[in-house]
Every structure is written in structure tokens, then in C-alpha cells.
């Protein structure tokens, strides 16, 4: 055998390199969108050798459909399936090196070529949890800690609106009649009334709580009105007393004359 077959170049050329065996990417007419705040930084925060190696393994492929949008920026910054980061809704395509096969997005299955950052293991990680897309326009996700991401998610989660019960006239009449009898009905009485008016006992209990609060407000306002009326009567009587005295004095003078 010729000695050239055992040269380093021939040996390395025969082995498939993970770096050069990325799945082919469909060409797109539009130029890919570049995010300046995300470009150049890896998911793990620091920009160095690990960042460049990771970017070499995973170049920015074009999203399926020919829209010209990157499915991953500097690694897997946007490579989470169906999550919003920045102003881009990413449908992550199964891209990856050929030595590992077509790999699903990070979080579902880890590729042996991609190192797992410490503190963010598996699909239960905070980074995999959906963060509202209004919160991360051009934001470096790798610089945020676990606590900061949790606080962002909690602050911007939409609160569920409570369903307000609409009572019929018959139900309101029955509830009001019982309220006139007792302000604090027991559980048995509430259950009996609930069966009568086709309501749940919890709804009856909430109605009585609200009705008692309204009754206390009305009672407080009526007492304040009565107190104000008494004060006004006292002040009006004190102002009218000198006039009455003058009239009484004039009447006394007339009687003397």
C-alpha cells in the first residue's frame, strides 16, 4: 500500500466531521434577520471559545417555509419549540450534526455534541418555560438568572378573570327573604336554600358575605347622616336663639307700654 494512504490528511478526510455535516438548509430569497443584541453571544452568557465552538456546530439555519427568519441565533437562543423570544415566533426545525442525526429542539433530547449548561438541565428548566414575547425584545437570555426569569414570568402572566354569577329575580328574592330573617345562616340553611333556588352552596355563601358588607355600609352611612342631621339642628337652634330673645324682649316692652 502506498504510504500516502496513512497520512494525516487522508485519515481526517475519511472521517465525517461533526462541524461540516450539518443538514443542508433550504435557500431563501430574503436575507436572514440579524438581532444585534443577540448576535455574537452564546446562550450561556460569555463570548469566548465555547461560544464560537457552539456557533460552529449550529450555524443559523433558515426557518422552514422560506420566510428568511433564523430558527436559532448563536446556538439555541431561539431554538425552543413554539416559544416567543423577542418579536419572533420560532418553529424550531430538527437541525443538528449528522453524527447525532436530526436532533429535536433543546430540552426534549440533549445531543452529545452540545454541552449542557450547569443549572439548566432538562425540559423543566426555567429557560424552557414560556416567557411572554413582549418581555424579551432583543434581550440576552443567557445573562438572566433563574430567579429573574421566574419573576418576569410571574409578573407578566395574565390573571384569570373570575366568572361573575348572574342571579335571577326568583333567586334574589329568596336570598333577600332569608337575609331579612338572619344575617348569618348556618351551613344547613344555606344548602337548603341552594337546592331550592338551584345554586351551589358556595355561591349562596359568597352572596351572603357581599350582602352583609353592603348592609354594614348602608348602616354606617345612615348613622353618619343622622349624626350630621343632629349637628345641623343644634347649630340652627343656637343661631335662632338670639333672634328669639330679641322678639321676647320687644314683646315685653310692648306689654309694659
UniProtKB/Swiss-Prot annotation:
Localization annotation: Nucleus
One Gene Ontology term from the biological process aspect of the record: negative regulation of Wnt signaling pathway
One cellular component term from this protein's GO annotations in UniProt: nucleus
InterPro entries linked: Goosecoid-like_HB (IPR051440), HD (IPR001356), Homeobox_CS (IPR017970), Homeodomain-like_sf (IPR009057)
Ranges of compositional bias, category Basic and acidic residues: 241-257
Keywords: Developmental protein, DNA-binding, Homeobox, Nucleus
Annotated DNA-binding residue span(s): 160-219
GO molecular function: DNA-binding transcription factor activity, RNA polymerase II-specific; DNA-binding transcription repressor activity, RNA polymerase II-specific; RNA polymerase II cis-regulatory region sequence-specific DNA binding; RNA polymerase II-specific DNA-binding transcription factor binding
Region annotated Disordered, chain positions: 213-257
Superkingdom field: Eukaryota
Keyword Nucleus in record: yes
SUPFAM superfamilies, alphabetized: Homeodomain-like
Role description: Regulates chordin (CHRD). May play a role in spatial programing within discrete embryonic fields or lineage compartments during organogenesis. In concert with NKX3-2, plays a role in defining the structural components of the middle ear; required for the development of the entire tympanic ring. Probably involved in the regulatory networks that define neural crest cell fate specification and determine mesoderm cell lineages in mammals.
Family of this protein: Belongs to the paired homeobox family. Bicoid subfamily.
Name of the molecule in the record: Homeobox protein goosecoid
Naturally occurring in which organism (per UniProt): Gorilla gorilla gorilla (Western lowland gorilla)
Name of the gene this protein is made from: GSC
